[in-house]
């Protein structure tokens, strides 16, 4: 047995006294004192961004506390880059509250005594202040503005066009007129002169139905703005069709005359024959000359692409800008009497409501002549200034009105460096302004891409704009347009939900054959094709006026989706798609699929009488189709590397 130990009462008392001493207050320092050789004695000439941030926070006395149980559920809609209903309502409210700050730059006051250098300096200062206001609006209010023109020279061209024009026409896209309309431009026109008139020309109006055009006409009527619905491409096709019909009629007349001439040659004598043919030839020549003269009188704008720019009727200005020298045509007449004749028509147009039908070229020119009633910038002449975004059809409108390609058509702003004036007829002059991108409010960048403001080929994230397309275009329209079958919603999802961007692009990529190197659908490439179809109008969505339900405004979505296939292949009865209304149940489909019921075995099979570990066994005579080969050969490695798409092909049905 060992030695008997004591009770250890003294040690327990010492431990108790030590614990009381540690818990009591003390005058000693409780914080760590950094020695002279510590890290704070080091020279800090260069610091990393993290070290600089931590040092600044330490000097400012900022403390960082870890946040726990900060759980936030992310909905499926937020992953698409789109706004929820509450967020969209909040953004629209902010847009309305800050609408008055969305202005265009003003030209400073000037007169005959203002020198050129003083005017340019004042313009630069005013433009710089305008840029600062927009930057403050984006930073402080957290609003998204469309890309706008930042070159002062283009705004100078706009100022000159407004000063020289009697009527300022804004050309907007019919699918979203409010996005391309600048209300502050209308206010600035009235600030320059109260005698000037504003008008909105809604281009691409053939994409709208009669009910949709009537709704927009009523909305702008309440706003007190004159609107005209116009389609440059449709009118150009109509005019070219009329020219072709005239050419066909002239060719038919020539053929009929030649047939009559040949029949007369068979009946008459040879001498009379020659005389009649000579007279007929002269008659044909005279008729052709009359036909050419009629064409020249009816259409004054023959194809003159080879003409130089100096041949156009252009206006030039001096350095001060107080004189307007125009090279008018020689045949220009005084329009004072004609203006007095149309004075009554102008008063009637002011009282008549906005009409909703598509106007033709002659009707549009008549509106230009009769809209302005006050004193004009130049006596006996109506100057119409055309202003608009790029890619809204401004150049196409000018070319259709003139009947010739006078202006280059381009979707890139900056093609036209200087404004130019083009005479349509004596007394009516079009003043073409360079394409300007004016500041406007948008909710997301996806909206700018779908509106054609941002280039599609330069986008980096394709999911938000494609998700916006899926929200606007119904599932059946997408399937009928591209001939695809988009995957159905699952059993636990809403059967009427919109397709996602991944579902649409996957189906489109499989159909077009746009695949990546790994055998998967190329979604970014497919997204560019779909977005270009949306911008061009193949996938049509029209924004309604404020206060109208967007879903009930889409009359074109109510049409039969098989109409395109019927027009392309004739009146063939389309096959009924039995899977269109089925809901995909992945569990049931995988369970009851017969291709999934299979048995797998690993190892060498008992063939040719060999079985591992049992030696030679009696095997019935194999048939010709069951002979596999030598069991010791590793033929099982064949087709080992299979593509995932080929293996899971049965899951796509």
From Swiss-Prot:
Q: Does the UniProt entry include the keyword Protein transport?
A: yes
Return the InterPro entries for the record. G_CP_dom (IPR030378), GNL1-like (IPR043358), GTP-bd (IPR006073), P-loop_NTPase (IPR027417)
Q: Which GO terms describe its biological process?
A: nuclear export; protein transport; ribosomal subunit export from nucleus
For bias type Acidic residues, the affected ranges are: 248-275, 293-320
State where it is primarily located: cytoplasm
Q: What class of enzyme is it?
A: hydrolase
* Any one GO MF annotation of this record: GTPase activity
Q: Which UniProt keywords apply?
A: Cytoplasm, Endoplasmic reticulum, GTP-binding, Hydrolase, Nucleotide-binding, Nucleus, Protein transport, Transport
* Subcellular location(s) per record: Cytoplasm; Endoplasmic reticulum; Nucleus, Cajal body
Quote the biased-composition stretches of kind Basic residues, using this chain's numbering. Answer: 631-653
Listed under catalytic activity are: GTP + H2O = GDP + phosphate + H(+)
User: Which spans does this entry mark as compositional bias, Polar residues?
Assistant: 276-291
Q: Which family does it belong to?
A: Belongs to the TRAFAC class YlqF/YawG GTPase family. LSG1 subfamily.
**Domain-level remarks:** In contrast to other GTP-binding proteins, this family is characterized by a circular permutation of the GTPase motifs described by a G4-G1-G3 pattern.
- The protein's name: Large subunit GTPase 1 homolog
């Amino acid at each position: 047995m060992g030695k008997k130990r004591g009770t250890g009462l003294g040690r327990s008392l010492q431990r108790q006294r030590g614990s009381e001493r540690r818990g009591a207050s003390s005058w000693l320092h409780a914080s760590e004192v950094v020695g002279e050789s510590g890290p704070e004695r080091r020279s800090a000439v260069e610091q990393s961004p993290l070290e600089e941030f931590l040092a600044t926070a330490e000097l400012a006395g900022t403390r960082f506390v870890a946040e726990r149980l900060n759980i936030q559920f992310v909905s499926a809609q937020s992953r698409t880059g789109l706004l929820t209903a509450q967020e969209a309502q909040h953004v629209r409210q902010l847009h309305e509250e800050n609408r008055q700050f969305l202005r265009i730059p003003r030209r400073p006051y000037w007169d005959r005594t203002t020198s050129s250098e003083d005017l340019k300096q004042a313009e630069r200062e005013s433009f710089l202040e305008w840029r600062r206001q927009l930057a403050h609006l984006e930073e402080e209010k957290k609003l998204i503005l469309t890309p706008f023109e930042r070159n002062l020279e283009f705004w100078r061209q706009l100022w000159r066009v407004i000063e020289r024009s009697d009527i300022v026409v804004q050309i907007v896209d019919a699918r979203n007129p409010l996005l391309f309309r600048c209300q502050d431009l209308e206010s600035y026109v009235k600030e320059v002169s109260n005698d000037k008139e504003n008008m909105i020309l809604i281009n691409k109006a053939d994409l709208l139905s009669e009910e949709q055009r009537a709704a927009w006409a009523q909305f702008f009527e309440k706003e007190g703005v004159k609107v005209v619905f116009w389609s440059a491409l449709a009118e150009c096709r109509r005019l070219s069709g009329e020219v072709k019909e005239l050419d066909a009629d002239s060719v038919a007349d020539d053929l009929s005359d030649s047939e009559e001439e040949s029949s007369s040659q068979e009946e008459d004598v040879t001498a009379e024959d020659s005389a009649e043919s000579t007279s007929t030839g002269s008659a044909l020549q005279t008729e052709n000359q009359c036909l050419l003269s009629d064409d020249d009188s009816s259409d004054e704008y023959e194809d003159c692409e080879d003409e130089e720019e100096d041949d156009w009727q252009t206006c030039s200005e001096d350095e001060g800008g107080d004189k307007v020298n125009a090279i008018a045509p020689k045949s220009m007449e005084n329009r004072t009497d004609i203006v007095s004749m149309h004075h009554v028509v102008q008063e009637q147009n002011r009282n008549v409501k906005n009409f909703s039908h598509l106007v033709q070229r002659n009707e549009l020119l008549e509106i230009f002549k009769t809209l302005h009633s006050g004193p004009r910038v130049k006596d006996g002449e109506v100057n119409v200034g055309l202003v608009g975004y790029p890619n809204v059809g401004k150049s196409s409108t000018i070319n259709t009105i003139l009947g010739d390609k006078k202006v280059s058509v381009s979707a890139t702003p900056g093609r036209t460096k200087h404004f130019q004036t083009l005479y349509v007829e004596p007394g009516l002059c079009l003043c073409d302004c360079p394409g300007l991108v004016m500041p406007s409010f948008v909710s997301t960048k996806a909206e700018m891409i779908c509106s054609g403001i941002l280039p599609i080929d330069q986008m980096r994230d394709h999911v938000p704009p494609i998700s916006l397309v899926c929200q606007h275009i119904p599932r059946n329209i997408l399937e009928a347009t591209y001939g695809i079958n988009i995957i159905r919603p699952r059993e636990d999802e809403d059967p009427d939900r919109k397709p996602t961007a991944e579902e649409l692009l996957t189906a489109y990529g499989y159909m077009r054959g746009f695949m990546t190197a790994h055998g998967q659908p190329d979604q970014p490439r497919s997204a560019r094709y779909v977005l270009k179809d949306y911008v061009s109008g193949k996938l049509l969505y029209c924004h309604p006026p404020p206060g109208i339900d967007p879903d009930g405004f889409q009359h074109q979505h109510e049409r039969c989706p098989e109409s395109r296939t019927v027009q392309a292949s004739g009146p063939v009865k389309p096959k009924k798609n039995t899977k269109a209304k089925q809901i995909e149940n992945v569990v049931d489909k995988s369970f009851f699929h017969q291709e999934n019921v299979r048995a797998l075995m690993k190892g060498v099979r008992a063939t040719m009488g060999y079985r591992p570990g049992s030696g030679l066994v009696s095997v019935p005579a194999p048939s010709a189709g069951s002979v596999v080969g030598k069991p010791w050969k590793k033929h099982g490695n064949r087709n080992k590397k299979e593509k995932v798409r080929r293996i899971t092909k049965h899951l796509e049905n």
